[in-house]
Amino acid sequence: MHRTMAVTAVLVLSAAGAAHAWGGLFNRFSSDMLANLGYGRSPYRHYPYGQEPEEVYAEALEGNRLDDVIDEPGHCYSAPCTTNGDCCRGLLCLDTEDGGRCLPAFAGRKLGEICNRENQCDAGLVCEEVVPGEMHVCRPPTAGRKQYNEDCNSSSECDVTRGLCCIMQRRHRQKPRKSCGYFKEPLVCIGPVATDQIREFVQHTAGEKRIGVYRLH
């Protein structure tokens, strides 16, 4: 009797051990088995369980955890530039001692305030000398602004009332040069452009090229 019970106990323990071993082999969790629940090879397998990608994106925005955001194209503060279009939003290509640089749109100096450079004055104002060799102030452009195809360094030198701004001209087999030209978008210009001063209808002088003139809408 005791021998029979011992044999039975050994058989039970052996069966339990075998079952545990087979379970360890076949009862393993596979993420592919739950592909529709946020795991496995579904398109959203990289997102936390139970969250749609839109929810994760919103949380990342709130927590400022977007590490892989691609920087806005174009140059940024104080970077070299040729036209306004080369700069980030809110910056303009301004002429400096080191050439064109992306700088804040307007320095904000008002009419009559002392200035040192053209780009220190608000749009529509130019930095002009009032005491030779000593003092410059911001004032409206005087008569005699540069006309079509005349050399320039900044758009404030050109007659904006006729739709002109300072543009980098590139012609075949010629060295690039800055000159006053007609424009449709201020992005092609160099420096601040007072578009509110442009006359709606511009009369062309004889010999000027009839290219598209900027018009207010």
Swiss-Prot record:
The keyword Membrane does not apply. Keywords: Cleavage on pair of basic residues, Neuropeptide, Secreted, Signal. It comes from Agrotis ipsilon. Residues 22-208 form a propeptide. GO terms for biological process: neuropeptide signaling pathway. GO terms for cellular component: extracellular region. Disulfide bonds: none annotated. ITG-like peptide: Expressed in corpora cardiaca (CC), corpora allata (CA), antennal lobe (AL) and gnathal ganglion (GNG) (at protein level). Expression in AL detected in all animals, expression in GNG detected in most animals and in CA and CC detected in few animals (at protein level). The lineage of its organism: Eukaryota, Metazoa, Ecdysozoa, Arthropoda, Hexapoda. It is found in: Secreted. Its main location: secreted. Residues 1-21 form the signal peptide. This is ITG-like peptide.
